């Protein structure tokens, strides 16, 4: 029996794209900081001149799948990380955005064969979002770790 597992220490040659929503940037900026910290501590060059990492900003979470698809389909990246924050309001808008971004990100991964990490927070309040972006823990770090594991795993599984 063969067992396939991703390793966090096999990140050296990975090419990673990160798509970040500007809307709720108080939250998404913190997620990005946590994500970049994780990637850096695991050997990914996160400098502005990096050839391993590209960063793309979109207006909001709804736009994430479109750009994630373009990046994943380019053949340049081993993994794409998506970061956003959708916070419930008084209208059904939350439900529409959350449904479309989650389905869209999943579809990009299935169609492209490139792992796409779903790092879009879906919370009822700003406080909940902030707790997940750094007050209690920073899920951006976890999303970075998931990207490293999936990038490594995909390299180890024969096509």
Curated annotation (Swiss-Prot):
Pathway, per record: Cofactor biosynthesis; riboflavin biosynthesis; riboflavin from 2-hydroxy-3-oxobutyl phosphate and 5-amino-6-(D-ribitylamino)uracil: step 1/2
Active site: 93
Family membership: Belongs to the DMRL synthase family.
Protein name: 6,7-dimethyl-8-ribityllumazine synthase
EC number: 2.5.1.78
Annotated keywords: Riboflavin biosynthesis, Transferase
One of the record's GO molecular function terms: 6,7-dimethyl-8-ribityllumazine synthase activity
Keyword Transferase: yes
Gene, per the UniProt record: ribH
């Amino acid at each position: 029996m063969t067992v396939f597992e991703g390793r966090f220490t096999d990140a050296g040659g990975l090419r990673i794209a990160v798509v970040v929503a500007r809307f709720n940037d108080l939250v998404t900026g913190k997620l990005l900081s946590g994500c970049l910290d994780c990637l850096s501590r695991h050997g990914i060059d996160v400098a502005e001149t990096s050839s391993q990492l590209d960063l793309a900003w979109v207006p909001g979470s709804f736009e994430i799948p479109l750009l994630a698809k373009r990046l994943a389909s380019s053949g340049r990246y081993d993994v794409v990380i998506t970061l956003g924050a959708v916070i419930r309001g008084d209208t059904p808008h939350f439900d529409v955005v959350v449904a479309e971004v989650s389905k869209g990100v999943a579809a990009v991964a299935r169609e492209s064969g490139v792992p796409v990490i779903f790092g879009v927070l879906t919370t009822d309040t700003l406080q909940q979002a902030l707790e997940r972006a750094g007050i209690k823990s920073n899920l951006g770090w976890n999303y970075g770790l998931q990207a490293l594991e999936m990038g490594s795993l995909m390299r180890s599984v024969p096509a």
